[in-house]
């Protein structure tokens, strides 16, 4: 009526159409159009928020206002909000990475593939050679003429080396430094090996001499006679004295018999 007349008369005052062209509504169901803000293009007015509380809800013919699909904006704040609040940073869902569980892929694949899992039996294995030794010492001969016995090397001398060393030992039981160097160079040994051989040879000679002396003392103790005891000589002396005293006695047959006893 009068309100509709004013609305149709002055279109410059209300540039936007108030009524939908396909609906014939009464003036009582009139609801003002949502205002538009040029500074905030992404802002949309929600009907019923700033309306008069005494007016109530609009009629059932009006539905709640929803923006069209073309007016939807992507995820994140608009340009106006970002300029107003510079502390907010827009990000897309593709930049978000969920927290990875520990042990899944924290290490590079090259490191994970190069380290094989160790079994409990492999972890308990003894990695050292000296821990795997048995109670029986093993003897191995190397190419340099040394024999490994338990904890030390024992030099294996040839027959020619032993012969030359024995000759030198019979000549002198204590070898000089000059002769030791000459003998080591001639036999292909070191001076330390020659010195150790002479030390062992002297120890062996002392052991042999000690054994010979013990055998000689045992033989001498078995061949010597035992000296006579003192009691035996005293008995022999008593027998001699008794025999000499008996020789001084006169036998009864030698005495003269008187005639009176005969008659």
UniProtKB/Swiss-Prot annotation:
GO terms for molecular function: DNA-binding transcription factor activity; DNA-binding transcription factor activity, RNA polymerase II-specific; methyl-CpG binding; RNA polymerase II transcription regulatory region sequence-specific DNA binding; transcription cis-regulatory region binding. Residues 150-209 bind DNA. The keyword Transcription regulation applies. Residues 204-213 have a biased composition (Basic residues). CDD domains: homeodomain. InterPro entries: Caudal_activation_dom, Caudal_homeobox, HD, HD_metazoa, Homeobox_CS, Homeodomain-like_sf, HTH_motif. GO terms for biological process: animal organ morphogenesis; anterior/posterior axis specification; cell differentiation; digestive tract development; embryonic pattern specification; positive regulation of transcription by RNA polymerase II; regulation of transcription by RNA polymerase II. Residues 82-97 have a biased composition (Polar residues). Keywords: Activator, DNA-binding, Homeobox, Nucleus, Transcription, Transcription regulation. It holds the Pfam family Homeodomain. Residues 47-108, 204-263 are annotated as: Disordered. It comes from the Eukaryota. Its main location: nucleus. Residues 214-233, 241-254 have a biased composition (Low complexity). Residues 153-174 are annotated as: Interaction with DNA. One of its GO terms (cellular component) is nucleus. Residues 192-203 are annotated as: Interaction with 5-mCpG DNA. It is found in: Nucleus. Plays a role in transcriptional regulation. Involved in activated KRAS-mediated transcriptional activation of PRKD1. Binds to the PRKD1 promoter. Could play a role in the terminal differentiation of the intestine. Binds preferentially to methylated DNA. Belongs to the Caudal homeobox family. This is Homeobox protein CDX-1. The gene is cdx1.
């Amino acid at each position: 009526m009068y309100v509709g007349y004013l609305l149709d008369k002055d279109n410059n005052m209300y540039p936007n159409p108030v009524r939908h062209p396909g609906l014939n509504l009464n003036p009582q169901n009139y609801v003002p159009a949502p205002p538009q803000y040029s500074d905030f293009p992404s802002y949309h007015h929600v009907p019923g928020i700033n309306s008069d509380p005494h007016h109530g809800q609009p009629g059932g013919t009006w539905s709640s206002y929803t923006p069209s699909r073309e007016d939807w904006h992507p995820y994140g704040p608009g340009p106006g909000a970002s300029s107003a609040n510079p502390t907010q940073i827009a990000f897309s869902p593709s930049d978000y990475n969920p927290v990875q569980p520990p042990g899944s892929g924290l290490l590079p694949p090259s490191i994970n593939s190069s380290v094989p899992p160790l079994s409990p039996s492999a972890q308990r294995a003894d990695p050292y050679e000296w821990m795997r030794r048995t109670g029986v010492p093993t003897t191995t001969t190397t190419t340099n003429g040394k024999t490994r016995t338990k904890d030390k090397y024992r030099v294996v001398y040839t027959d020619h080396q032993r012969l030359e060393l024995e000759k030198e030992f019979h000549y002198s039981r204590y070898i000089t430094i000059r002769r030791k160097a000459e003998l080591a160079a001639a036999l292909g040994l070191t001076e330390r090996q020659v010195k150790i051989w002479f030390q062992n040879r002297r120890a062996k000679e002392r052991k042999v001499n000690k054994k010979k002396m013990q055998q000689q003392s045992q033989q001498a103790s078995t061949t010597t006679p035992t000296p006579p005891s003192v009691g035996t000589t005293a008995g022999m002396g008593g027998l001699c004295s008794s025999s000499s005293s008996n020789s001084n006695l006169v036998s009864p047959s030698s005495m003269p018999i008187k005639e009176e006893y005969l008659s």
